[in-house]
A protein has these predicted regions:
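Short coil/loop linkers at secondary-structure junctions
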Residues: 2-3, 30, 69, 110
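Duplex nucleic acid-engaging cores and interfaces of nucleic-acid transaction enzymes
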Residues: 22, 38-41, 48, 52-283
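Short hydrophobic/aromatic-rich motifs at helix boundaries and adjacent loops
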Residues: 28-32, 45-46, 72-73
Length: 283
């Protein structure tokens, strides 16, 4: 109770534009003798909280404007105070460029995608013939379009994204390769140890990670963050596949497409940005 009051009082002083040294020295009675380090931490957490609240408001407004806000989704958004989780919840409603899945939906293939995703004993190859039209000229085109819709659903699955993030946090590898046309430049030589380098991201010290990123930024190396592809597929399979059925092979193809085209680039970039932020803080 007392700690909560002290934090509340400190936040109020910060909102009144009092500086951290001033609060620490002259408002000890109000803050319960908090020192500068503690006040700085409160200020940092308060800023993070404000960012989350603003983002939450913007997300709710956007989804409401699309008439897509269900009571269940509203509750999930209201209860979340994790920025990444909020972005995952918003992903299906985010305005984006026209995707392959959008084209497939326009061509009437969403019902076929739902049948395949249900993974029951339907003869999907036969059912695909019922979705032919001017744009979808054969069975394989219908199945391909349905798989593209499924790939987007998998990409937007909050549980898939969470589990892949965990995999990358634990097991991601950094790989660097020299850009051959730049290899012999004088300025490239200070980065020569990264011309062909690979190590677990968790083992890379901050100074090395930042040096690699500088080398990439200056165009001397290509930098990749990767996780074992089979482990990534296993993560998705466990959350998406429902055992063997005539649809299984189509869902597996959609999983592979979703991971390579959509999930892997996004999760790898997130993992790298997080690692860079930590490295910057430690440098």
């Amino acid at each position: 109770q007392t700690a909560s009051i002290n934090i509340h009082n400190t936040v109020k002083l910060l909102e009144e534009d009092c500086t951290i040294p001033f609060i620490s020295r002259y408002r000890k009675d109000t803050t319960g003798n908090l020192d500068e380090v503690q006040i700085e931490q409160i200020a940092k957490l308060q800023k993070e909280y404000e960012v989350i609240v603003k983002r939450k408001e913007a997300i709710l407004k956007s989804i409401e404007e699309q008439n897509a806000l269900t009571p269940e989704l509203d509750k999930k958004i209201q209860q979340s105070f994790d920025l990444q989780e909020l972005e995952d919840l918003y992903l299906p409603y985010k305005k984006k460029k026209r995707t392959k899945a959008d084209v497939a939906r326009e061509n009437g293939l969403e019902p076929l995608a739902k049948i395949i995703m249900a993974q029951k004993n339907d003869d999907v190859d036969f059912l695909a013939t019922q979705y032919l039209n001017d744009a979808i000229v054969n069975e394989e085109s219908a199945l391909q379009g349905a798989r593209e819709i499924i790939a987007e659903w998998i990409n937007e699955n909050i549980y898939v994204r969470k589990q892949l993030r965990r995999l990358y946090e634990r097991k991601a590898t950094i790989t660097t390769k020299v850009v051959k046309t730049k290899k012999d430049e004088a300025d490239a030589q200070k980065f020569s140890q990264y011309f062909d380098w690979s190590e677990p991201l968790t083992k890379a010290p901050s100074h090395r990670l930042l040096a690699m990123l500088r080398a990439e930024n200056e165009g001397f190396i290509k930098f990749k963050v990767e996780a074992d592809i089979d482990e990534a597929y296993d993560v998705i399979d466990e959350l998406v596949l429902k055992g063997q059925s005539p649809s299984t092979s189509h869902v597996q193809l959609a999983i592979e497409d979703s991971y390579k085209r959509l999930l892997q680039p996004a999760i790898a970039n997130e993992t790298l940005q997080e690692a860079k932020a930590k490295a910057d803080a430690n440098s």
